[in-house]
């Protein structure tokens, strides 16, 4: 029986599911046990990650000009990152991060490895392979954001505006999922999907995601 894009996306997402032990920080935030300074550093790092990812997704959209389904996927991702960039300052302000500190902040290498690799994908990966890898990674990210948004309200007293950045990623993304499915299906039918490369890209994204959270837990 011929595999569908939906089956492939589900399979690879399951294969690349995070080991809960790889992220020690989100459980601490969920319990209200993470120091507020760690939340501030999270905000500072995301102030660098989000615009970088947006530009990377725009580059992937440009490189997908011959693949309209992949183009639509990466364009939608870039639009989402633009919204996230608008919402992020409220979270940073709630963490006590002032503009002067944000401007002078030196980012942590372990936190910036993820966006650096997304930028590498933007320049080197076949667009359809990148769709598959990125979609698998977003499943874990969305779960983390849902947990953090709830914890910020419950344990840290943050209001809706301060949590809106995480709410954006925590909610269902059915339209994006359908767009990813169409992009992968088109690549399957055209014979241009390299599952081995997509899996390798996905594993590296998951590893850099885990490194991001481990670095935040011990920023020094």
Language-model segments: residues:
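Sequence termini and other peripheral, non-core segments
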Residues: 1-9, 40, 116, 214, ...
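Acidic, low-complexity proline/glycine-rich segments
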Residues: 1-26, 105-109, 174-178
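Active-site-proximal alpha-helical scaffolds that flank and shape metal-associated catalytic sites
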Residues: 6, 69-171, 207-210
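Alpha-helical bundle segments that constitute or directly flank the non-heme di-iron/ferroxidase center
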Residues: 10-21, 29-64, 129-147, 206-213
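Short, charged/polar, low-complexity loop and linker segments
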Residues: 26-31, 120, 188-192
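A non-catalytic, amphipathic alpha-helix used as a structural packing/dimerization or gating element
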Residues: 41, 45-48, 52, 76, ...
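Transmembrane alpha-helical segments of integral membrane proteins
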Residues: 178-187
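Acidic, carboxylate-rich catalytic segments that either coordinate divalent cations
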Residues: 192-220
